[in-house]
Amino acid sequence: MLTRQQKELIVKEMSEIFKKTSLILFADFLGFTVADLTELRSRLREKYGDGARFRVVKNTLLNLALKNAEYEGYEEFLKGPTAVLYVTEGDPVEAVKIIYNFYKDKKADLSRLKGGFLEGKKFTAEEVENIAKLPSKEELYAMLVGRVKAPITGLVFALSGILRNLVYVLNAIKEKKSE
């Protein structure tokens, strides 16, 4: 049992985290073993280090922390047993992918991913799958570079073709003059 002072400390800590986080995702964790949750935390730690956490916190404490961090419309997520995934560093979409794939791998009901906030915007359980299917920041950068690079590559090939043709014409003129 936590003392009042410990609870106040948790609320203060969570409020500060929620003010600077890019992702808050609420999930029902019942049915998972301690080993399962340890595996999920390991996957997150492998990708994010200390930049992401999956934490079980009492709903009353989460409610106070979210209220202090000035979030609105979160009450629907705090029904039943609730764990919270939050990301303070790195790509938040990748964290959604990790937990979504974890639930899929464990054959858990995906609706148990209750929803949350991505970059301050609320999303529902139904939208979790759509977010998980978004490309990561690295993939988006690669697509952007590919799109920028394609016209430049085309220009290089066009210019090299013109130069090649010029060389052929000059060689033909040289051969004609040498005859």
From Swiss-Prot:
- Keyword Lipid metabolism attached: no
What PROSITE patterns does the database record attribute to this sequence? RIBOSOMAL_L10 (PS01109)
Stored InterPro entries:
Ribosomal_uL10, Ribosomal_uL10-like_sf, Ribosomal_uL10_bac, Ribosomal_uL10_bac_type, Ribosomal_uL10_CS_bac
Task: Spell out the residue ranges making up region: Binds L7/L12 dimers.
Answer: 137-179
Tell me which UniProt keywords the record has, alphabetically.
Ribonucleoprotein, Ribosomal protein, RNA-binding, rRNA-binding
Coiled-coil segments: none
Q: Could you tell me the superkingdom of the organism this chain comes from?
A: Bacteria
- Write one Gene Ontology MF term: structural constituent of ribosome
GO cellular component term of the entry, any: cytosolic large ribosomal subunit
Q: What are the recorded Gene Ontology BP terms?
A: translation
Assembly with partners or alone: Part of the ribosomal stalk of the 50S ribosomal subunit. The N-terminus interacts with L11 and 23S rRNA to form the base of the stalk. The C-terminus forms an elongated spine to which 3 L12 dimers bind in a sequential fashion forming a heptameric L10(L12)2(L12)2(L12)2 complex.
Q: What is this protein called?
A: Large ribosomal subunit protein uL10
Q: Give the organism the record lists.
A: Thermotoga maritima (strain ATCC 43589 / DSM 3109 / JCM 10099 / NBRC 100826 / MSB8)
Classification of source organism: Bacteria, Thermotogati, Thermotogota, Thermotogae, Thermotogales
